[in-house]
Curated annotation (Swiss-Prot):
Catalysed reactions listed for this entry: (3S,5S)-carbapenam-3-caboxylate + 2-oxoglutarate + O2 = (5R)-carbapenem-3-carboxylate + succinate + CO2 + H2O
The protein's required cofactors: Fe(2+)
EC number: 1.14.20.3
Compartments, as annotated in UniProt: Cytoplasm
Family note: Belongs to the TfdA dioxygenase family.
Biological process (GO), any one: antibiotic biosynthetic process
Activity modulation: Inhibited by L-N-acetylproline and by D-N-acetylproline.
InterPro entries (alphabetical): AlphaKG_dependent_hydroxylases (IPR050411), TauD-like_sf (IPR042098), TauD/TfdA-like (IPR003819)
Gene3D superfamilies with a match to the protein in the record: Clavaminate synthase-like
UniProt entry keywords in alphabetical sequence: Antibiotic biosynthesis, Cytoplasm, Dioxygenase, Iron, Metal-binding, Oxidoreductase
Name of this chain's protein: (5R)-carbapenem-3-carboxylate synthase
Residues annotated for substrate binding in this entry: G104
C-alpha cells in the first residue's frame, strides 16, 4: 500500500494541499511528489530551516536544476539555490512583478518541481504574493475562443533581462509550446506580458496577432485564470514553504516595490530525469 500524508485542500475545488510541518518532515519524498501531481501545490507553515537544510529537502525530489560550467552565469551565477531577495535593478531577483509563467522555458531547462521558502519576511502583509493557477481545470472550463488560441496559435517569447539569462536563452524570438501532453496532464508553458510600468524580464507575442490583439487576448485570459475557482494567492510569512508541480500549475509574483519591505525567499528546482 502506498504511503499517505494527511493534508487539507487549499481551494474550494479541492486543489492544493496544506500539510502540517511535522507531517511534512516525516513524509516520504515520493509520497509528496505523488500528492503534488494530483494536488498541484503544497503549503507548509512554520518550517524553521536554513538554506542548507532547504537544499537537503528539495534535492531529494529529483535531479537539481543547477547552472554550472557553460551555464554558470545564469541568474548572476547562483548555481542551484536562487536567493530572491528583492535586489534593486534586477527583475527575476528583484521587487517587481513576474506575471504568469512556468519555470524553465526561457532557459530551455526541464523543471518539474519548484520550491520556495520564506527565510525572512518583514513589513509586508498584503503585497508581494506568489499566486498559483490550476491551469488544467481552467482549460477544461475555458471559453472555446480562448482555448482555441492556446491550442492552435504559435506563441513566441524573447528574453529582455540578459544579465539573468546570459547566453543560455536563444537570441531574439523563439517558439514556446503552450501544451505538452505528458499523459497524466497537459503541461502548460506560457509567459504572460508584464504590466505597463513594470520592468520586463521577457516579452511574449502570438504569431500573426497585432500588438493590440495580443494584449487583448492576454488580458481576457488573465481575467479568466484569476477567478477564485482556479487561483490561489499566497501572502508570505516567515517559515512558509510552497512547493509546486511545474507541469500542473503556472504561477506569478506580485510586485512589492517598497524600500521598507523585506522579502527574502530561497528557490530550488528539481527535474524527474
Amino acid at each position: 500500500m502506498s504511503e499517505i500524508v494527511k493534508f487539507n485542500p487549499v481551494m474550494a475545488s479541492g486543489f492544493g494541499a496544506y500539510i502540517d510541518h511535522r507531517d511534512f518532515l516525516e513524509a516520504k519524498t515520493e509520497t509528496i511528489k505523488n500528492l503534488l501531481m494530483r494536488q498541484g501545490f503544497v503549503v507548509v507553515k512554520n518550517l524553521d530551516i536554513d538554506s542548507d537544510t532547504f537544499r537537503d529537502i528539495y534535492s531529494a525530489y529529483g535531479t537539481i536544476v543547477e547552472y554550472a560550467d557553460e551555464k554558470i552565469g545564469v541568474g548572476f551565477g547562483y548555481r542551484d539555490t536562487l536567493k530572491l531577495e528583492g535586489e534593486k535593478g534586477k527583475i527575476v531577483t528583484g521587487r517587481g512583478q513576474l506575471p504568469f509563467h512556468a519555470d524553465g522555458g526561457l532557459l530551455l531547462s526541464q523543471v518539474d518541481q519548484v520550491f520556495l521558502y520564506a527565510a525572512e519576511i518583514k513589513n509586508v502583509k498584503f503585497r508581494g504574493a506568489t499566486t498559483v493557477c490550476d491551469h488544467a481545470l481552467a482549460c477544461q472550463e475555458m471559453p472555446a475562443h480562448l482555448l482555441r488560441v492556446l491550442e492552435e496559435e504559435t506563441f513566441e517569447v524573447r528574453v529582455l533581462e540578459r544579465g539573468y539569462y546570459v547566453d543560455v536563452s536563444p537570441d531574439g524570438w523563439f517558439k514556446v509550446p503552450v501544451f505538452t501532453d505528458l499523459g497524466w496532464v497537459r503541461k502548460m508553458l506560457i509567459y504572460f506580458p508584464f504590466d505597463e510600468g513594470q520592468p520586463a524580464s521577457w516579452e511574449p507575442r502570438i504569431v500573426g496577432f497585432t500588438d493590440h490583439e495580443t494584449q487583448a487576448f492576454f488580458q481576457e485570459l488573465g481575467a479568466f485564470l484569476k477567478q477564485p475557482r482556479y487561483y490561489y494567492k499566497h501572502f508570505w510569512e516567515d517559515g512558509d514553504l510552497l512547493i509546486m508541480d511545474n507541469r500542473r500549475v503556472i504561477h506569478e509574483r506580485e510586485e512589492f516595490n517598497d524600500d521598507d519591505i523585506v522579502r527574502r525567499l530561497y528557490r530550488g528546482q528539481t527535474a524527474d530525469i
